[in-house]
Amino acid sequence: MELEEQERDILFPTDDEECQVDVSCDDEDDDSSSYSSLSQNDSAPWPRSYRQSVDILTGVTPPTISFIHRRSSQTSFTSSVASLYKRRPTSIANSFASSTSKQPLLSEKDDVLFLSSQIGLSNTDLSYGEPNFCSFPQSVLNGINVLCGISLLTMPYAVKEGGWLGLCILLSFAIITCYTGILLKRCLESSSDLRTYPDIGQAAFGFTGRLIISILLYMELYVCCVEYIIMMSDNLSRVFPNITLNIVGVSLDSPQIFAISATLIVLPTVWLKDLSLLSYLSAGGVFVSILLALCLFWVGSVDGVGFHTGGKSLDLANLPVAIGIFGFGFSGHAVLPSIYSSMKEPSKFPLVLLISFGFCVFFYIVVAICGYSMFGEAIQSQFTLNMPQQYTASKIAVWTAVVVPMTKYALALTPIVLGLEELMLPSEKMRSYGVSIFIKTILVLSTLVVALTFPFFAIMGALMGSFLAMLVDFIFPCLCYLSILKGRLSKTQIGICVFIIISGIVSGCCGTYSAIGRLVGKLD
């Protein structure tokens, strides 16, 4: 098979096109108009802002001062944005075209210019410094921070639903998702133009693949925002359980009051232009996970709640819900390409995945065993809701579960906001801070409506894990890998991918059906 067919019509640049990303400040003024016109090319694929916004969400690259000619009030955020585009040198004119779509992928400088237009920076404010990559320990911390999130709280509940043997499924999911993360790496290595998960989708299936994957990733972030509201509401209701309010004949109970209160608290953080502080705070997610696990163990061992034997070995009727929750626990593939792209030594990415997934599955299993052993069949959707409030460790855990979503909500919503602005307001003249505030406010209020309608943390997590995580973390990595590297794979590699795809389809269908059934039953 010819090279062109194997690489899905990759367009190689001519000598005249070979212009490196690292451009000096003197040359930039002369070229800014051409770069600006390229970045605003109508044929550029949506979403163009995905990589930048997700990198801001995860903080995968340590920030450096790479923007100049700007007052210090803007330095922190702009420097963070500039640091997102430090990767191996590539040609500014390189473009990728699949057999089904000839729309080019954006270069790194196009990405920077596009995002600078979103946050109100001019071309003359930009300068491109030396590459600033993540070290191996930083990459490991980023990986753990992405994977080990709010799903940690619901692992004991998943064991209650599926039984002790459900932990075998948790372990198998960790192995599978770690492997599919490596498949994404191999897809990225097939072309220097591929940077993000949507890029991989376009390489495999044209613009349709890019669009489907982008929508799924944005849906994941949206559901996370809903989960944050529910999480804050549930834990605040645990602290203040007897609060009620009657407004114009409408009676609100404690969870509803605190869902509204939590929304009002996070709303100003969404309006912020500078998200750097929130990004730094959310980067401590790994330490939060350790703190929550320690608090749970402390309450069980020191405060006297104790650990008890017993429980179901296997509950086939409720196992699909547990499958969805376990899938929810490993839904981090949306940003794994960004972690890979930011590494000083990309060859160590498989080791980063191995350590990150190993850490997460270890903590998931420990928390699941401790929580279910302590509270048994009485375990609730979040183990913090079962912890006796008279103990200091319980109070620390509950308030940690309240504060953490406040730092993460705006970061999770930002990629959705930028994607919608890009889609709904294609012209820069139509964009303004006021319009952005309006879109953000509507999105925040919509998450409140969903949280009030479906205030079931574990079931929403199970639905997300069954439907979205199975597609994003199981099925699409294998499909993209088979498509991009078609003709160069062994029968064993193909067989493994087919097995994972079938497993994802079966798990996704069973889990989604069960989760929807639970939601309907709760609403009746």
From Swiss-Prot:
<dbReference type="GO" id="GO:0031090">
    <property type="term" value="C:organelle membrane"/>
</dbReference>
<feature type="transmembrane region" description="Helical; Name=1">
    <location>
        <begin position="139"/>
        <end position="159"/>
    </location>
</feature>
<keyword id="KW-0812">Transmembrane</keyword>
<feature type="transmembrane region" description="Helical; Name=5">
    <location>
        <begin position="280"/>
        <end position="300"/>
    </location>
</feature>
<keyword id="KW-1133">Transmembrane helix</keyword>
<feature type="compositionally biased region" description="Acidic residues">
    <location>
        <begin position="14"/>
        <end position="32"/>
    </location>
</feature>
<feature type="transmembrane region" description="Helical; Name=9">
    <location>
        <begin position="442"/>
        <end position="462"/>
    </location>
</feature>
<feature type="transmembrane region" description="Helical; Name=8">
    <location>
        <begin position="398"/>
        <end position="418"/>
    </location>
</feature>
<dbReference type="GO" id="GO:0006865">
    <property type="term" value="P:amino acid transport"/>
</dbReference>
<comment type="similarity">
    <text>Belongs to the amino acid/polyamine transporter 2 family. Amino acid/auxin permease (AAAP) (TC 2.A.18.5) subfamily.</text>
</comment>
<feature type="transmembrane region" description="Helical; Name=3">
    <location>
        <begin position="211"/>
        <end position="231"/>
    </location>
</feature>
<feature type="transmembrane region" description="Helical; Name=4">
    <location>
        <begin position="247"/>
        <end position="267"/>
    </location>
</feature>
<protein>
    <recommendedName>
        <fullName>Amino acid transporter AVT1G</fullName>
    </recommendedName>
</protein>
<keyword id="KW-0472">Membrane</keyword>
<feature type="transmembrane region" description="Helical; Name=2">
    <location>
        <begin position="164"/>
        <end position="184"/>
    </location>
</feature>
<feature type="transmembrane region" description="Helical; Name=6">
    <location>
        <begin position="319"/>
        <end position="339"/>
    </location>
</feature>
<feature type="transmembrane region" description="Helical; Name=10">
    <location>
        <begin position="465"/>
        <end position="485"/>
    </location>
</feature>
<dbReference type="InterPro" id="IPR013057">
    <property type="entry name" value="AA_transpt_TM"/>
</dbReference>
<feature type="compositionally biased region" description="Low complexity">
    <location>
        <begin position="33"/>
        <end position="43"/>
    </location>
</feature>
<feature type="transmembrane region" description="Helical; Name=11">
    <location>
        <begin position="496"/>
        <end position="516"/>
    </location>
</feature>
<keyword id="KW-0029">Amino-acid transport</keyword>
<keyword id="KW-0813">Transport</keyword>
<feature type="region of interest" description="Disordered">
    <location>
        <begin position="1"/>
        <end position="47"/>
    </location>
</feature>
<feature type="transmembrane region" description="Helical; Name=7">
    <location>
        <begin position="349"/>
        <end position="369"/>
    </location>
</feature>
<dbReference type="Pfam" id="PF01490">
    <property type="entry name" value="Aa_trans"/>
</dbReference>
